[in-house]
UniProtKB/Swiss-Prot annotation:
<dbReference type="GO" id="GO:0005737">
    <property type="term" value="C:cytoplasm"/>
</dbReference>
<dbReference type="InterPro" id="IPR027462">
    <property type="entry name" value="ZapD_C"/>
</dbReference>
<keyword id="KW-0131">Cell cycle</keyword>
<protein>
    <recommendedName>
        <fullName>Cell division protein ZapD</fullName>
    </recommendedName>
</protein>
<dbReference type="GO" id="GO:0000917">
    <property type="term" value="P:division septum assembly"/>
</dbReference>
<dbReference type="InterPro" id="IPR009777">
    <property type="entry name" value="ZapD"/>
</dbReference>
<dbReference type="GO" id="GO:0032153">
    <property type="term" value="C:cell division site"/>
</dbReference>
<keyword id="KW-0132">Cell division</keyword>
<comment type="similarity">
    <text>Belongs to the ZapD family.</text>
</comment>
<comment type="function">
    <text>Cell division factor that enhances FtsZ-ring assembly. Directly interacts with FtsZ and promotes bundling of FtsZ protofilaments, with a reduction in FtsZ GTPase activity.</text>
</comment>
<comment type="subunit">
    <text>Interacts with FtsZ.</text>
</comment>
<dbReference type="InterPro" id="IPR036268">
    <property type="entry name" value="ZapD_sf"/>
</dbReference>
<keyword id="KW-0717">Septation</keyword>
<dbReference type="Pfam" id="PF07072">
    <property type="entry name" value="ZapD"/>
</dbReference>
<dbReference type="GO" id="GO:0043093">
    <property type="term" value="P:FtsZ-dependent cytokinesis"/>
</dbReference>
<keyword id="KW-0963">Cytoplasm</keyword>
């Protein structure tokens, strides 16, 4: 099954973009080659670019507190597993405390590092990070893998509380949705949402069908049009019914 996610607002769109960047970053720092570490560093610069567009820290703290208060309301519910609820509440407190303790603007420690900023300025230029452009960076790439990883972890560590908070918020949002089996007649599906404030939808589909969803939505209406891709040809409308699972997620 392939899971497609579609954000209903810019706030969730930003969180999903940052999560995607973090997953790429985590993959590349799990490797040892200098080129992998170059991409990890470039990805970290992209994280700063996306995270710097909004005051994410205060927004995430408010959302974590809202979720905590909501979950506290389930403490007296006998149908809720107390141990699991306590574990989530503990994680919320831990993540919030770490985010509060993180000082200053997101990524300020990197922006104040002139060497890293010189690398960032060259990496946005196609082919701009060659050894004759950045000899000191070229020398760093010839350090041991252990030393490079230690440096990257040192630079990323102040950002970790932000990404822990993003992960928790998106986890709770995803878990709020309940999958419902649907069929798109002749590759098309519409649903009235009656103005309910959803934040995200999740669509599960069997990859063997070869159907690719193109999604558009607002608080009143959801449209899904399935297409198919044949090699390097332009996607075309999918011919036939498409079974899928739809989850509408909201806090």
């Amino acid at each position: 099954m392939i899971v497609y996610e579609y954000p209903f607002n810019e706030r969730i769109r930003t969180l999903l973009r940052l999560e995607d960047l973090y997953e790429k970053f985590a993959f590349f720092i799990g490797q040892d080659h200098p080129q992998h570490h170059h991409v990890a560093l470039a990805t970290m610069f992209e994280m700063l670019e996306v995270a710097g567009r909004a005051d994410l820290k205060s927004d995430l703290l408010q959302e974590l507190e809202r979720q905590k208060q909501t979950l506290l309301g389930f403490k007296s519910n006998p149908n809720v597993e107390a141990e699991m609820l306590d574990a989530i509440l503990f994680d919320l407190d831990r993540i919030s405390a770490a985010l509060i303790a993180s000082q200053g603007k997101t990524g300020q420690h990197i922006r104040e590092n002139e060497w890293l900023m010189s690398i960032r300025g060259r990496t946005i230029i196609p082919g701009g990070a060659c050894e004759f452009d950045l000899p000191s960076y070229y020398a760093w790439q010839h350090d041991s893998a252990e030393q490079r990883l230690a440096d990257i972890h040192k630079w990323f560590t102040p950002l970790a509380p932000l990404f822990d908070a993003i992960g928790m918020v998106l986890r709770l949002l995803r878990e709020s949705g309940r999958p419902v089996k649907m069929i798109a007649q002749t590759g098309s599906y519409q649903q009235m949402l009656q103005g309910k404030a959803y934040q995200m939808l999740r669509l599960n589909i069997d990859e063997a069908l070869g159907a690719i969803p193109e999604i558009s939505a607002n608080k009143y209406m959801l449209w899904i049009r399935f297409t198919s891709q044949d090699g390097d040809m332009k996607p075309k409308a999918f011919e036939g019914d498409v079974p899928f699972e739809l989850s509408l997620c909201s806090f």
